[in-house]
């Protein structure tokens, strides 16, 4: 370790000396350790309390004809951060602490950032020049080195409802032609390991495909032609380009996240994904956002009993649901599809008096949420 640190220090003082090819860094509590290799292709491995979590995991990003992560690293920097972060919308507490150690690999037109937290590790690519080339491919791998039980939400389509049941099986027992929606959980000895992403903007979401004792990221290429689906206001890509996004630009890419937890309940308490995400509109006003429980008519298909009217998509049903929400201290009623025309939010269903429902709900102290498909608000 001293030899590694000497090489790192020497690289700062004498730029002509080759930077360290193996870098080690730990979490603030020293339980998580990452080992980064920069020779030929950048890769990393992880351990917690001496237990191997991830074996050697190579990573790269193909921009135009260049493959980032395979060229010569020019410089390595480190820093430690511990600062209070106030939640945009308060929950059980108003703020948390963003505490991590960071290693940064600096290249000619990009850099790779690694952050090591007490509850996980993440890395991302950062474009430092306004690169006009398309991003053609990203290679993401989570290699465990041996088989472990995994929790996956499997699908065989890049566009779907994400409503499948979870499959609990060893990685090697999963069908290799399927892939899972993130996050995926893997049990490594006594630890719960969560594979996920964070800060996803203007980039395809990551699916995770099982391979031998591993998961690999796969991504939907940029849509070429889009067509309506089944006559509904859903749009599907019928053909795709040969790239992920048309222009790289000067930007940050999504974080590739490995959460490492001592038990399942720790996952619920973790703010790792939140801390890795960035607020895009710094001056935006979020004070109007009020957290709360919601009564959603879709869950019970508007089946209510012992009433003197016909239940369904109508004003009386929603007034009844508002009364129920007020009585049981439920902050919101969500009115699902049917309150407007399918393809026009401004054409209201005459059987659902939205202004009357909203006025009544306000008097009862209940908020109204109106469901819409994304194509109607773009």
Question: Residues of each region from the PLM?
Answer:
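Bacterial Sec-dependent N-terminal signal peptides
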Residues: 1-22
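Substrate-binding cleft of carbohydrate-active enzyme catalytic domains
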Residues: 288-378
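Short, cationic low-complexity segments
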Residues: 279-289
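Compositionally biased regions
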Residues: 14-17, 28, 363
């Amino acid at each position: 370790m001293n030899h590694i640190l000497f090489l790192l220090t020497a690289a700062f003082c004498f730029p002509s000396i080759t930077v360290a090819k193996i870098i080690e860094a730990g979490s603030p509590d020293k339980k998580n350790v990452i080992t980064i290799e920069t020779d030929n292709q950048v890769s990393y491995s992880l351990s917690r309390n001496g237990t191997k979590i991830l074996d050697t995991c190579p990573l790269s990003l193909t921009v135009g004809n260049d493959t980032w992560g395979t060229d010569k690293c020019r410089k390595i920097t480190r820093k430690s951060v511990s600062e209070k972060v106030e939640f945009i919308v308060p929950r059980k507490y108003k703020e948390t602490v963003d505490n991590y150690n960071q290693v940064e690999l600096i290249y000619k037109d990009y850099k790779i950032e690694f952050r090591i937290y007490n509850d996980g590790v993440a890395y991302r690519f950062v474009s430092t020049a306004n690169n006009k080339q398309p991003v053609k491919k990203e290679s993401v791998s989570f290699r465990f080195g041996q088989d472990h039980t995994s929790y996956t939400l499997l699908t065989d389509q890049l566009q779907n409802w994400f409503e499948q049941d979870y499959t609990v099986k060893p990685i090697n027992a999963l069908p290799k032609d399927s892939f899972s929606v993130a996050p995926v959980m893997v049990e490594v000895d006594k630890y719960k390991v969560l594979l996920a992403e964070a800060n996803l903007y203007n980039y395809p979401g990551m699916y995770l495909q099982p391979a031998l004792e591993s998961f690999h990221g796969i991504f939907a290429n940029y849509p070429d032609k889009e067509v309506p689906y089944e006559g509904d206001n859903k749009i599907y890509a019928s053909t795709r380009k040969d790239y992920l996004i048309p222009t790289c630009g000067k930007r940050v890419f999504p974080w590739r996240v490995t959460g490492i937890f001592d038990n399942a309940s720790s996952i619920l308490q973790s703010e790792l994904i939140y801390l890795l995400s960035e607020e895009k509109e710094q001056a935006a006003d979020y004070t109007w956002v009020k957290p709360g429980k919601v009564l959603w008519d879709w869950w019970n298909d508007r089946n209510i009993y012992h009433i003197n009217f016909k239940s369904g998509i109508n004003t009386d049903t929603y007034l009844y649901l508002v009364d129920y929400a007020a009585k049981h201290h439920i902050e919101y009623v969500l009115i699902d599809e049917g309150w407007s025309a399918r393809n026009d939010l401004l054409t209201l269903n005459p059987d659902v008096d939205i202004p009357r429902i909203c006025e009544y709900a306000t008097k009862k102290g209940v908020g109204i949420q109106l469901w819409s498909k994304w194509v109607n608000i773009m």
